[in-house]
Structures are given as structure tokens and as C-alpha cells.
Design a protein with these regions (language model features):
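Acidic/His-rich, metal-assisted hydrolase cores and their charged scaffolds
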Residues: 1-221
């Protein structure tokens, strides 16, 4: 799910808590939770970054010192492996790195955005692990290609099979293309006026009389 979407974070937080697991968040999410926790008006909206049900994932830094022998490197060098805003989280009591996740995978719900899939190389998800992708369904070629790239990663780690299919569930009133076509076919409407879409060319494939809506336009029903 998007890194700044704290409402979705809350959904996974509650799911992890109710299933007896820790939610593992990344440093950007920890920073956001810290900001909200320090707000007079918003401190109760979301858990604090040091919440007992949360772990903060510390990735490899620029020099990848996190798993190196600190008798050969100083603590100061380890801190300098991370940017200034990241360093304060290195002292949090609830931090974990890839070794903790890899060793105890059943204890965690691990957040891994599309931009941090390289962390899977270290984490090494167990074959058959579950992956939940809480994002908008692709609606253009660029997004479809990106999803195929994501599938390559998860096929590589045995999380999805070679058929490259995953179960889809839609919420908040959204439907996939097959479901929308089913509604259009079943309605047998004389005219179709798509409202909440950027690509009514798909609707024009499915219905002979589609009106394209323009901003501030007036349409007779």
C-alpha cells in the first residue's frame, strides 16, 4: 500500500494485532507516525512508532554496515550509514532488520513497498508466504507493466505460482474490468455516461452509445 496511506496502515496494524503478529513498518512510516504522535490534535489517530505491536525495519544503509562486525567499524560509522532523519530510529527499542524477519517470519506482517523489493533478497520469504497488495488496480499500460514486474519478484520467491495469478478482492465500491462489463451488459441501458473514470475508451468497447463527460459540461438524460 502507499507509504503515506496511514488509514491502510491502520488496517494492517489491526489485522496483525488480531492475529498475534507484529506489523513491521519502514522508516518513512515510522517518521510519519512520530509526527502524528507529537501533534496536539492528531496524537490519538494512529499508534506511536514505538507501539508494542509495531516493529521498525532498518534496511541496509549506503555501506551495508548493519550486519557487519562492529569491532571493525565504530558505532559512529554505523550511524553515518543512514541519513540524518533516519538515525534517531536506530535507538528505538523495537527495531528489526532482515535477520530478525528471516528467522521468525510467522511473527510478522512485513510491509514492503514496490520501491523496496530488494529487501526480499535478504528476507527470503518462505515459499507459500502470503502477499497482500492493497493498491489501485492497473488502469493504464504503464501500471500493467509495473504489476508484471512485481509479479516477477514474487514468482521468483515462490509466493505466486508460474501461472502468475493472484486472488483479487475489491472494496470501497470499486470493481475490476470484468465486473464493470458485467454490470454494463446486465443493465441493457440505452446510453452510458461514465463518471468516475479517466479511460472511457474501455466503456466504448462494451457499449455502442457512450457519452464522454467533460469538466463543467451539461448532459441531458
Amino acid at each position: 500500500y502507499p507509504v503515506r496511506d496511514l488509514d491502510r496502515l491502520m488496517s494492517f496494524y489491526l489485522a496483525a494485532k488480531n492475529s498475534g503478529r507484529y506489523l513491521v513498518i519502514d522508516l518513512k512510516q515510522a517518521y510519519l507516525l512520530k509526527l502524528f504522535s507529537g501533534s496536539v490534535y492528531c496524537s490519538k489517530l494512529y499508534p506511536a512508532p514505538d507501539d508494542k505491536n509495531i516493529k521498525i525495519f532498518i534496511p541496509r544503509g549506503t555501506w551495508s554496515l548493519i550486519d557487519k562486525d562492529l569491532t571493525k567499524f565504530s558505532q559512529e560509522q554505523l550511524y553515518k550509514d543512514y541519513t540524518t532523519w533516519q538515525r534517531e530510529f536506530l535507538d528505538y527499542p523495537n527495531i528489526v532488520d532482515y535477520r530478525d524477519i528471516a528467522k521468525n517470519q510467522k511473527e510478522f506482517v512485513f510491509y514492503c513497498s514496490d520501491f523496496n523489493l530488494q529487501n526480499l533478497i535478504d528476507v527470503k520469504p518462505n515459499p507459500g508466504s502470503s502477499y497482500i497488495r492493497s493498491l489501485t488496480e492497473p488502469f493504464d499500460l504503464e501500471m500493467e507493466l509495473k504489476e508484471e514486474q512485481i509479479k516477477n519478484w514474487f514468482e521468483r520467491f515462490g509466493i505466486i505460482g508460474k501461472e502468475r495469478e493472484w486472488n483479487k478482492v475489491h472494496v470501497s465500491g470499486h470493481g475490476d474490468g470484468v465486473q464493470i462489463k458485467h454490470v454494463i451488459d446486465g443493465a441493457k441501458a440505452k446510453k452510458l455516461i461514465p463518471i468516475h473514470t479517466q479511460h472511457d475508451e474501455y466503456h466504448k468497447k462494451w457499449h455502442p452509445n457512450v457519452t464522454t463527460v467533460k469538466q463543467h459540461g451539461v448532459y441531458q438524460l
